[in-house]
C-alpha cells in the first residue's frame, strides 16, 4: 500500500496538468482543489454575460502551484467557506451593463439618436468606464472557486431583479472609482480587497491568495483609470469639490458616472443633474420652421419708413417778372438752349443751370399738350401697343402762351 499510494497522486497531478493545458486561459483558474468541489456542487450556475472571460493578468499565474501539493489526500476535500462580499462588488460591474445594453441596442444612424438633443455632442466618459470595466473583468476572472460561485449568484440575482442590479452597479462603480488615498470603502462597511488578500494569505489558501493578488492588481488599474478620468468626471455630478468621484457615487447613486454612461450611450433615459447647462438644440432644428420647434428669428420683411414727400420734394421756384421775360425771349429764339447759353443766362439772372433747364422742359411740354396734332410715329407705335402716351406736335414755333 505504501508503494501504490504515490501512484494516484502522480496520476492526479498529470491529469490536472493535462486539463489545465487543454482548458482556455480564462477558465484555468477554476482547477484549484477548492474550485473543483465548489464548481461540482454548483454546476447549474451559468454566467449571464455572452462574452468570453478575458485573459488573466500576468502578475498572478496560478498554473505552476497546482503540480506541488504532496500534503493533499487522494479523496476530494470539502469545499472552503465562501469569501466575504467585496469580490462580488469587484466582479459585478464587469457583467452588469450587458443586459441593459442588450435591451437598448442602437446603431449610430438610428432615428432615436438623431432626434435626441445631444446628437452630435462628444462623449468623453465611455472610454474610462470601459477601461475600468475591463480591469474589473480581469480581476473577476482571476478570482478563486468561492468567488466564482458568489459572482455567478450575483449575476443570476441581478438578472432577476433589475432594481437591485442598479444599486449593485452603483456601489461597485463607486468602489472601483475610489482613489488610493481617498480611504473610501464599500458602502456596506465591509473590508476592502487588500484586507481580503491579507486574510487569504494568512489562511494558507494559495488559490484565494492568488485571486486576491489579481483583485489588488485590478483595483490598482481601476484607481489609475479613475485618476485619469477625474478631471472629466468632476463636473458631471452635483458638488464637484465635495470629494472624490467614488465618494460622490457612493453617497448619491443617481449621479454616478456609470449610470450616466448607461443612460446616454445605450439609448436609455438621460439623468439630468441640478447644475446642468440649459438645453442646447442641434443645428438641424433651425433648418425647418414648425410650431413645435424653436425658431432662429422672425422671417418678416422690415417695414420701410414712409418718406415725407414735402421735405424731399424740391421747392417750387418763384421766378420774377424780369427772369420770366428773359426766359421767354430765349425760348422764342431757340426751344432747346445750349449749355454755353444756359451758363451765361444763369449768371445774368442769378439762377441755377438746373432751374433754367427745367423751365425749358416744362415750356415744351405745355406747348405740346396745348396743341391737338398727334405725332405720326407716336400714333403708329400706339396702334401696335408699344406706346401708350398721348403726344402732340407744335407746328407754329412762334406761338407763345
UniProtKB/Swiss-Prot annotation:
Q: Name one GO molecular function term.
A: DNA-binding transcription repressor activity, RNA polymerase II-specific
The record's listing under Gene3D superfamilies reads: Homeodomain-like
Compartmental location = Nucleus
Q: Which UniProt keywords apply?
A: Developmental protein, DNA-binding, Homeobox, Nucleus
Q: Is Nucleus there in the keyword field?
A: yes
Q: Name one GO biological process term.
A: dorsal/ventral pattern formation
Q: Which GO terms describe its cellular component?
A: nucleus
Query: Has UniProt tagged this entry with the keyword Plastid?
Result: no
Region Disordered: list its residue ranges.
1-102, 138-167, 229-253, 293-315
Q: Which SUPFAM superfamilies match?
A: Formin homology 2 domain (FH2 domain) (SSF101447), Homeodomain-like (SSF46689)
Family membership, please give it.
Belongs to the engrailed homeobox family.
Protein's UniProt name: Homeobox protein engrailed-1
Organism whose genome encodes this protein: Mus musculus (Mouse)
Q: What is the lineage of its organism?
A: Eukaryota, Metazoa, Chordata, Craniata, Vertebrata
State which gene encodes it.
En1
